[in-house]
């Protein structure tokens, strides 16, 4: 076990495959180049080895079967002794520690009053107090303690709130459900309430609590941790247990794992116990010990064992975040990004020279690569969620330079494959449930992050021009001319096409029902908002294409809702809870969209009179959506659905009244509205669009954008350019190294321009590609060619058939006859850059339209 002990204590010795591939347990270790034909145990005993994934001798003894790499042949590599000695002497003199680095980050972000990093947080907190917590004239609410989040609730909450914040920030339907979520803006609220003065608690003498626990007790609590913790996918159970057995385990990592386990394992629930807790089992003592171990850890040890350090940091950061300690959590997670970035660079650089080692037939390098990938996506998801709450843009990540998504299911997970091969299967079902949630979280994060940054970096010309001083306005105009890009009215169409392709991929590739339902609900909800995206200040007429797309989205959402009660129950209740809440928000968005469509519908247009069958179908959809809102499985979200039910009940009758008159007779809009209001006198929709509270904010108005308006009317239509922000803070937000040029420290992720127009097309399409023109992959596909004549025929087609709305739904029907056009590329390229305006105030949320329906019954 000596060779494996070195790997457990020093993960940098483990291999790094060029690309993760499917694991084949039938492949013998003798076929792997660079490995001994005999396992470590057989070579030590000098007995014949069967050379299987788990040899017969190790299987009989029920021990780990390890195949170590062969010794290098030839002369050893010459090393520069002078440079190495000089660097070692310099390192000994400076003796930097992890605690010093974390404390420096804490001071720069939250204590210091100068610098872009501190201004980023402090200005966001000030804007939050001004615009979110602004007391009403009627009363000043008393401050209430912010409720904490459990671990599984926080993990499930991330994806849901990212979608919700995107809709509230750039959607067209207001923010009625803002107050219905007690954890809304959890990060910025925790940051605004916190007054922690330092990164670490005052030092005190403390004996190691691990020695007093005993190995058997430690192993049992580790099993319990893998049973209950939602982040179990960032730790390999087999590698951790082997390190405990060999006494090479990272004490900080083990202490934080035991702290979480003992906190969940409450002996007070057992009536046969006295309820007393021994000091070595105190979660606070273990947590303090883990933080102290990391605080005094030399940075050289971090570089030698980066994976275990990153695991301890992300678990500590997650615990602090769930407790509402946002300051320390930001630093822990930020430094985790830095550690993962360095290891990612090192593994990419040394990919061809890495030695391979197998444990029970599984490549340890693939296991470590999966762990790093899972930690990376947790960091990215948390950072994206936090930056969206503080209303700041962030660096877009080039997809070909980031790790792959986490494993879609347990069959492709090297971590779980190793646990099965090692017979560590007691907590496997819980580990599978925890691992399955990382994939939809990563999918939603990557999608929402790009849409958020696109909208945030493509505001209206009016707001940005007025934001610049008069004596520099011409400089911004020249810069806009230099950075030509597509017309902003095309943005919704581009995003719509990309989301449709993402929906097609999810429907085709994802087999887990709960994951598929959550992703489809989230993306269809975004599409509903995009159809009425407030990109223009004046409302545009509703077109048959808008009616068609909205009808197909509602039909798909109804299909998903019909399947929700039959979905298998998740072992993590919070995941099912927030997935169901996402459906409630989706139904609320559909109700807003139907009311908006009715209020802006012009019956005097001939093409609108011809769309009467489509409106009848929408009325039926409104009726079915109203029935879904009354379902028992949505009963916990009455605060969201109560106004939605009122809107749906009203718009159902209003749309039917709109279609009662013969289409051959022109009917005025006022007559139709009066007919609808005759049945519901207490309900009369307002036609005034939402207004901006102050210049400079992106509109949350009610202007509906026709898809025809997305297409320039003439080849000479001038494209709109984007005015760059007034301030560009340090893009290396979490990095202290000049080579790390991005928010998360990964190389090559910060670019000088978020858009690059290389196409001569008059519409200046936005297409997503890499720097070398290659496609990003299945997730980021090319946008449709909106100048193609087939798209016009698609938009002019019959709104939608009269088939059952809860059957045969999917992206193909949303695409219409032009679905085949979604894969066309114009060759334009997509770059990224971190644009921040730290002085920009937090957006003032406009009130929703629920007040219109406050007196209307369900």
UniProtKB/Swiss-Prot annotation:
Phenotype upon gene inactivation: Loses the ability to produce pyranterreones.
- GO biological process per UniProt: DNA-templated transcription; positive regulation of metabolic process
Kindly give the InterPro entries that the UniProt entry links to this protein.
Answer: TF_fung, Transcription_factor_dom_fun, Zn2-C6_fun-type_DNA-bd_sf, Zn2Cys6_DnaBD
This entry's Gene Ontology molecular function terms read: DNA binding; DNA-binding transcription factor activity, RNA polymerase II-specific; zinc ion binding
SMART domains from the UniProt entry: GAL4
- Gene Ontology CC annotation, any one: nucleus
Residues annotated as DNA-binding are: 39-65
Transferase listed as a keyword: no
* Alphabetized UniProt keyword annotations: DNA-binding, Metal-binding, Nucleus, Transcription, Transcription regulation, Zinc
Q: What is its main location?
A: nucleus
According to the record, the residues making up region (Disordered) are 1-35, 72-99
What Gene3D superfamilies does this protein's entry cite? Zn(2)-C6 fungal-type DNA-binding domain
Where is it located? Nucleus
Alphabetical list of PANTHER family matching this protein: ZN(II)2CYS6 TRANSCRIPTION FACTOR (EUROFUNG), ZN(II)2CYS6 TRANSCRIPTION FACTOR (EUROFUNG)-RELATED
State its role.
Transcription factor that regulates the expression of the gene cluster that mediates the biosynthesis of Pyranterreones, a family of antioxidative compounds.
Protein name (Swiss-Prot/TrEMBL) = Transcription factor pytR
């Amino acid at each position: 076990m000596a060779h494996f002990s070195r790997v457990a204590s020093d993960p940098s010795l483990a291999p790094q495959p060029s690309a993760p591939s499917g694991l084949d347990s039938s492949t013998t270790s003798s076929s792997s180049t660079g490995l001994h034909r005999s396992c470590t145990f057989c070579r030590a005993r000098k007995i014949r080895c069967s050379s299987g994934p788990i040899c017969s001798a190790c299987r009989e003894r029920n021990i780990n079967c390890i195949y170590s790499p062969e010794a290098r042949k030839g002369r050893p590599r010459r090393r520069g002794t002078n440079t190495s000695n000089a660097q070692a002497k310099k390192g000994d003199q400076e003796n930097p520690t992890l605690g010093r680095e974390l404390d420096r980050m804490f001071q720069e972000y939250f204590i210091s009053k100068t610098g872009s990093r501190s201004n980023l947080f402090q200005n966001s907190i000030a804007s939050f107090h001004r615009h979110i917590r602004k007391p009403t004239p009627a009363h000043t609410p008393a401050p209430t303690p912010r409720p904490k989040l459990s671990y599984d609730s926080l993990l499930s909450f991330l994806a849901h709130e990212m979608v919700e914040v995107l809709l509230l920030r750039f959607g067209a339907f207001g923010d009625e459900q803002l107050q219905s979520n007690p954890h809304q803006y959890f990060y910025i609220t925790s940051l605004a309430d916190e007054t922690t003065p330092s990164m670490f608690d005052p030092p005190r003498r403390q004996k190691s609590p691990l020695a007093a626990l005993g190995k058997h007790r430690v192993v049992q609590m580790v099993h319990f941790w893998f049973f209950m913790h939602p982040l179990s996918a960032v730790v390999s159970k087999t590698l951790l247990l082997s390190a405990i057995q060999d006494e090479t385990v990272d004490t900080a990592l083990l202490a934080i794992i035991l702290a979480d386990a003992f906190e969940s394992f409450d002996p007070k629930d057992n009536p046969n116990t006295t309820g007393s807790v021994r000091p070595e089992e105190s979660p606070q003592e273990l947590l303090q010990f883990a933080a102290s171990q990391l605080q005094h850890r030399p940075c050289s040890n971090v570089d030698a064992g980066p994976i275990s350090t990153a695991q301890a940091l992300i678990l500590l950061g997650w615990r602090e975040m769930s407790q509402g300690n946002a300051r320390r959590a930001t630093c822990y997670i930020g430094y985790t990004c830095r550690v993962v970035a360095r290891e990612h660079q090192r593994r990419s650089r040394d990919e061809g020279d890495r030695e391979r080692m197998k444990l029970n037939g599984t490549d340890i390098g693939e296991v470590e690569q999966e762990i790093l990938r899972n930690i990376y996506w947790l960091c990215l998801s948390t950072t994206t969620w936090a930056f969206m709450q503080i209303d700041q843009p962030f660096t877009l990540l080039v997809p070909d330079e980031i790790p792959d998504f986490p494993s879609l299911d347990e069959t492709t997970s090297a971590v779980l494959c190793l646990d099965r091969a090692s017979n560590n299967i007691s907590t496997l079902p819980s580990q599978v449930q925890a691992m399955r949630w990382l994939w939809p979280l990563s999918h939603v994060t990557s999608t929402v992050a790009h849409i958020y940054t696109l909208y945030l970096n493509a505001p209206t010309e009016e707001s940005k021009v007025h934001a610049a001083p008069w004596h520099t306005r011409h400089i911004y105009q020249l810069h806009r001319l230099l950075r030509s890009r597509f017309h902003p009215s095309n943005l919704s169409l581009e995003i719509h096409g990309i989301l449709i392709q993402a929906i097609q991929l999810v429907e085709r590739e994802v087999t887990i029902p709960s994951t598929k339902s959550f992703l489809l609900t989230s993306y269809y909800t975004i599409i509903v908002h995009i159809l009425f995206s407030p990109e223009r200040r004046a409302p545009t007429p509703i077109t048959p294409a808008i009616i068609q797309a909205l009808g197909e989205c509602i039909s798909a959402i109804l299909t998903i809702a019909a399947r929700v009660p039959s979905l298998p129950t998740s072992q993590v209740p919070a995941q099912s809870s927030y997935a169901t809440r996402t459906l409630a928000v989706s139904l609320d968005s559909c109700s807003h969209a139907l009311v908006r469509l009715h209020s802006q519908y012009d019956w005097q247009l001939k093409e609108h009179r011809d769309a009467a069958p489509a409106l009848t179908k929408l009325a039926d959809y409104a009726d079915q959506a109203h029935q879904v809102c009354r379902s028992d499985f949505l009963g916990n979200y009455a605060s969201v659905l109560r106004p939605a039910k009122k809107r749906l009940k009203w718009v159902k009758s209003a749309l039917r009244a709109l279609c009662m008159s013969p289409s051959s007779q022109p009917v005025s809009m006022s007559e139709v509205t009066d007919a609808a209001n005759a049945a519901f006198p207490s309900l009369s929709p307002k036609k005034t669009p939402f207004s901006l509270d102050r210049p400079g904010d992106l509109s949350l108005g009610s202007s509906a954008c026709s898809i025809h308006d997305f297409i320039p009317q003439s080849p000479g239509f001038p494209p709109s350019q984007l005015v760059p922000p007034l301030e560009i803070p340090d893009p290396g937000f979490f990095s202290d190294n000049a080579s790390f040029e991005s928010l998360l420290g990964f190389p090559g992720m910060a670019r000088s321009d978020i858009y690059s127009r290389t196409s001569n097309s008059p519409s200046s399409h936005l297409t997503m590609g890499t720097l070398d023109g290659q496609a990003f992959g299945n997730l980021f596909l090319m946008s449709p060619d909106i100048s193609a004549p087939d798209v016009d025929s698609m938009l002019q087609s019959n709104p939608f058939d009269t088939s059952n709305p809860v059957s045969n739904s999917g992206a193909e029907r949303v695409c219409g006859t032009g679905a085949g056009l979604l894969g066309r590329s114009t060759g334009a390229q997509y770059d990224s850059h971190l644009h921040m305006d730290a002085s920009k105030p937090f957006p003032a949320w406009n009130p929703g339209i629920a007040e219109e329906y406050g007196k209307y019954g369900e």
